Amino acid sequence: MGWLEIIELRSSEISREKMEDNLRKLVRDFSRINNELEIKAYKRIDVGTDSSIHILSRSTKSVSTASEIGEKLKAILKEYGYVSHIVWSELDD
């Protein structure tokens, strides 16, 4: 049983290129901190101001709240615009 956090960002005042560079740096930095999690950044194909970071864990322990890394990323991304943060739990077999 794993879990997935999705942190979506809708930015308005920053160029797409700069936002993508910032997201790449955040993913690199946070991946170094915790190698148990898979952290990836995505950009929305049809909306240039939308991006997201996905944090995937294959941990067997259940979660009921966002991870510490997820909360930190959310706080950082709020500087750039509207942020949505959702935690998903994998269905048991």
Predicted feature residues:
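Short S/T/G/P-rich N-terminal loop/turn motif that feeds into the first structured element of a domain
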Residues: 1-50, 55-71, 86-93
